[in-house]
């Protein structure tokens, strides 16, 4: 029997996948638990439309990530913060502060989780930061940390 999965099922497939299973498995396990629906012509058409919509959205996200990477790759963001006499910061520069600096400088709103810091920034200086804009698109940004009043 052909069914369309409505949820991720271990060892069978992910949501939205068309799979062939035995009649008993479908009728006694998948269908009663709402893990799948019977594959009819209408549902197959609906599944195809959903896949096309999802592909279009993914392509738009990829194109948007590429545009952002083109603007941000090799760019420099300046962050001003309080520091002691020796150049050590009072606290550290976080992903959130870098995301705010990118938004203020380039008008690009970026989720802080997409910013990959190799180590915490705890001193003045220039640091290389990797931006993971999409699973296949990365950009490298230089963060320059300067003391207030300099």
Swiss-Prot record:
Pfam families: Ribosomal_L9_C, Ribosomal_L9_N. It comes from the Bacteria. Keywords: Ribonucleoprotein, Ribosomal protein, RNA-binding, rRNA-binding. One of its GO terms (cellular component) is ribosome. GO terms for biological process: translation. GO terms for molecular function: rRNA binding; structural constituent of ribosome. Coiled coil: none annotated. Belongs to the bacterial ribosomal protein bL9 family. PANTHER family: 50S RIBOSOMAL PROTEIN L9 (PTHR21368). HAMAP family: Ribosomal_bL9 (MF_00503). Binds to the 23S rRNA. This is Large ribosomal subunit protein bL9. It comes from Moorella thermoacetica (strain ATCC 39073 / JCM 9320).
